[in-house]
């Protein structure tokens, strides 16, 4: 079980360390919990997906001019374990990138409730006076081209929150 509360600069390294520790303990399956995770850095979630998924596009963005940027997994280190991802209505942005890629590749099972639906990239531009402005600069799409903004990602198995207390979930319970 690995809980990710946001996707920051150090998140991928922390994820890799946690998975290695679990492997050393004889891990047979992996549960990634991104409930209540508002997102974070695209590069951080892409690094984690590089550890999880086989080679291919994990997400792509398009700006207002239709310019597309693909983010890919090299597929060299992908995990060979059954995978469940816990999601809810507070899972947004980078959390949805993770959930969308896992779902599109059919690499794991999404469990919980429909995600928030933030399918946009926002960039912070600092101003000379010390203030900053945050602008939407692109839309993002799942590997299969799904635009989830305002819609979210539906789980494969819908379970309400009270059944998904992170302290009580085990792999067997997640698949029962």
Task: Indicate residue ranges for each PLM-predicted region.
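Short hydrophobic-aromatic micro-motifs
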Residues: 2, 133-135, 148-149
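Short, acidic, Ser/Thr-enriched surface-loop or helix-capping motifs
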Residues: 142
């Amino acid at each position: 079980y690995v809980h990710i509360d946001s996707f920051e600069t150090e998140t991928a390294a922390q994820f890799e360390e946690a998975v290695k520790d679990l492997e050393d303990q004889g891990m047979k399956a992996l549960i990634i919990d991104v409930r209540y995770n508002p997102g974070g850095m695209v590069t951080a979630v892409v690094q984690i997906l590089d550890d999880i998924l086989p080679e291919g596009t994990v997400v792509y963005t398009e700006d207002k001019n239709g310019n597309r940027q693909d983010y890919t997994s090299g597929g060299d280190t992908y995990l060979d374990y059954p995978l469940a991802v816990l999601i809810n209505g507070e899972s947004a942005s980078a959390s949805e990138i993770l959930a969308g890629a896992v779902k599109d590749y059919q690499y794991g099972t999404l469990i919980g409730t429909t995600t928030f639906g933030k399918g946009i990239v926002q960039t912070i531009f600092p101003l000379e006076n010390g203030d900053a402005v945050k602008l939407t600069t692109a839309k993002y799409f799942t590997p299969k081209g799904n635009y989830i903004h305002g819609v979210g990602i539906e789980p494969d198995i819908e379970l309400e929150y009270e059944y998904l207390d992170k302290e009580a979930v085990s792999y067997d319970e997640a698949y029962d």
